[in-house]
Amino acid sequence: MKIILANPRGFCAGVDRAISIVESALEIHGSPIYVRHEVVHNRFVVNGLRERGAIFVEELHEVPDGAIVIFSAHGVSQAVRQEAKNRNLKVFDATCPLVTKVHMQVARASRKGTKAILIGHEGHPEVEGTMGQYDNPEGGIFLVESVEDIAKLGLRQEDDLTFMTQTTLSIDDTSEVIEALKQKYPAIQGPRKNDICYATTNRQQAVRELAQQSDLVIVVGSKNSSNSNRLAELASRMGVVSKLIDDANDIDPTWLENVTTIGITAGASAPEVLVQSVVKRLQELGVTRVEELQGCEENTVFEVPRELRITEVN
């Protein structure tokens, strides 16, 4: 048996930045540091930060007045920002800059009174934060997850409409929804470039290539990670058995029966150490070769806030 590693895989620039913000805040300010929601959707990462003194909460009422709080990479609503200000909380914002870009699109629509349609998954924290950027009662923001949802929209063709998307969606599914929106509302406006982020796009393209060469695709990522789920779904759609796992402990040896090539990738919030532990476990189960796809190079870097930049002194 052999392993083929997808490339690119694992951490993206937004996740790197979010984790660095929590780590730097702990180093500079000490614990406790409060984090609203899991800073990224990965159990291994969150547990590691928790051990270092980060306290993860779901709502700001769990944070003492005047404390330091970090907003997760998924972003928050304007109401949450205002609550933090009212509570005199010291905020470090780990929202991914690519999510912030979508927030700005929604805020612009809100100011103009343009009705906005967000393509995304209901209940996902990124969606909640993005919809929370719209505060104009004369307009409105509406969530659709599928082509079927479009028929339920009570909007008119003559309405001033715009759309935007969650950053971690399936490229194929989103393209279908956008096309259906344009058919129903020919005058609808949208971003010049798809809001799905570069990392999501690159990892889905890598899985396409991986699935063509594999009998089994293993995606390393947490169950609540949107982009990890999309990777597993994509491999399945291509006719390959796919498994989404947190770590090597989730591997079932029976998966390897009649398998000669195992493809491995990782969601944007899964660290490389987990991938390597999966490789090691599979080698114990009989894998003899490890190869890696050439893929594309990613060199995007997002800076942490200035006051959290740690300068090494020689």
From Swiss-Prot:
InterPro entries: LytB/IspH
Pfam family, one: LYTB
Gene Ontology MF, one: metal ion binding
Alphabetical keyword list: 4Fe-4S, Iron, Iron-sulfur, Isoprene biosynthesis, Metal-binding, Oxidoreductase
Residues annotated as catalytic: 126 (proton donor)
Single Gene Ontology BP annotation: terpenoid biosynthetic process
Note on cofactor: Binds 1 [4Fe-4S] cluster per subunit.
Name of the protein in question: 4-hydroxy-3-methylbut-2-enyl diphosphate reductase
Protein's gene: ispH
